[in-house]
Design a protein with these regions (language model features):
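Conserved catalytic core of the tyrosine transesterase superfamily
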Residues: 1-327
């Protein structure tokens, strides 16, 4: 690997580049996966592998061992990248068989996601709104308040919210245009009166902005949008000040928990409105920018409230049948 260019240079450089192009042609960003392939490419160079016959199961195991991962999920992701590369090469008939024989690590008991209820989210927004300006940026309170509100109220990813430009906010039609998201697709996200009011207030405070001007920026000339990492750091700085207790079995709160909270909150509202969530999961999946409802299902942490609503729904469905059986 050439550190300056980030290009593959080892014995499998051509195969890796072709695999990466194929995946991106399917609409995948493959950013983290590319990093994993670059690590493997660098390892092959360091080991002076100059013939593909030298790429054995033992070599793959040695590569994985050279990249210690404390969490099973991280290890399994790296293993998956290498495994997918060779599976693709076998399907393309460029390799006879895959040298990857390593098994995934078993994850420990999965922790649940911390979910913000309405009052907790309001606490976070209040703290964000009170953030003072500093040497690194002005209008910090309004910027972070609005970004967190968009994530909690519309389920946006942090990168989607932070990259918004003025032209992406259509107050007349009440929609946001989310451009080239995680899967290189764009989508429209409608918003209600509360989000509209917050966006109007924010835009009035900011004054006239050009169509491509970033909505959220600390740059004096507004040439660059706020970064996702900056928003994440601010969230983690605010979290201890909330004084909230993390339930037993729940993971430490992350900024992405706001998006999870939106998904679970939507499901709960559907239950309470008598809407069948199974019939609307595609709608939620599209709204959140997923390519398949299976991806959305990951966000739907089962809570006591959801279990209670699902139980009530089952009893309403089953009551007539149980009555017939009892007669």
């Amino acid at each position: 690997m050439n550190p300056a260019t980030g290009k593959f240079e080892g014995i499998m450089a051509g195969e890796m580049a072709d695999f990466l192009r194929h995946q991106r042609a399917l609409g995948k960003r493959f950013i983290n996966e590319e990093r994993g392939l670059l690590l493997f490419d660098q390892y092959l160079i360091e080991q002076k592998i100059e013939a593909v016959t030298k790429i054995t199961p033992e070599l793959v195991d040695a590569f994985l061992a050279s990249r210690p991962r404390s969490r099973p999920r991280s290890y399994n992701h790296l293993l998956s990248v290498v495994r997918r590369l060779f599976k693709w090469l076998v399907r393309q008939e460029r390799w006879l068989q895959s040298p990857v024989q390593s098994r995934p690590r078993h994850a420990t008991a999965a922790q649940t996601t911390f979910l913000f209820d309405r009052s907790q989210a309001q606490q976070l927004l209040k703290l964000a709104a009170e953030l003072p300006d500093n040497n690194h940026g002005r209008n910090r309170g309004k910027i972070y308040f609005t970004i967190f509100a968009l994530m909690y109220g519309l389920g946006l990813r942090v990168a989607e919210a932070s990259r918004l430009c003025r032209q992406d906010v259509d107050l007349e039609r009440k929609v946001l245009v989310i451009r080239e998201t995680k899967f290189l697709k764009s989508r429209l996200v409608p918003f209600g009166p509360k989000i509209e009011a917050r966006l109007r207030e924010y835009l009035q405070r900011e004054g006239a902005l050009g169509p491509t001007t970033p909505l959220f920026s600390f740059a004096p000339d507004r040439s660059k949008p706020i970064t996702s990492s900056t928003v994440t750091q601010t969230f983690h700085a605010l979290w201890p000040r909330l004084g909230l207790k993390v339930p037993a079995g729940a993971a430490s709160p992350r900024l992405h928990c706001l998006r999870h909270s939106f998904a679970v909150g939507t499901l709960l509202r559907w239950y309470r409105s008598g809407i069948n969530p199974q019939q609307r999961l595609w709608d939620l999946s599209t709204f959140m920018g997923h390519v398949h409802p299976a991806s959305t299902a990951v966000y739907l942490t089962i809570t006591a409230e959801l279990l209670d609503e699902a139980n009530q729904r089952f009893h309403r469905f089953a009551a007539p049948l149980l009555k017939e059986v009892a007669q």
